[in-house]
Amino acid sequence: MAVCVGMQILTEFGEESSGIHALGVFQGHITQFPRAMTGRAGEPLKVPHMGWNEVIQVAHPMWEGIPDRTRFYFVHSYRYADVHADCVVGTCDYGSFFAAALARDRVFAVQFHPEKSHDPGIQLYRNFLAWDGTC
């Protein structure tokens, strides 16, 4: 299980630090949030994205016991924006949609911080310990 930057290094490339070739477990690139972003109602959004936000789930055993659209805690300035990739099992809306969770084989990665996300975060860790790697 990978968390935050841990998820980012599992992709192919990230823009952070003038560009980093990563591990390539997941296809795709990590891009920086635009400096000037607005929400759906036109309100300005700050970067880094910091705070609680809903995660829209795609069916996966790691979400067992966690309702769809549960709020998790985020702190990040970079994102995996290809929300249509086969590996995306959770998305979040912050100015635009980005991947909040990726999964492939026995690997599960999240952009948010389960350790700061109270009961849902604890449940996610329980699910990881119980997960047999099948989807």
Please provide the spans of the model-predicted regions.
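Cysteine-nucleophile active-site neighborhood
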Residues: M1-H49
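Amide-donor transfer/coupling interface in amidating biosynthetic enzymes
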Residues: H29-C135
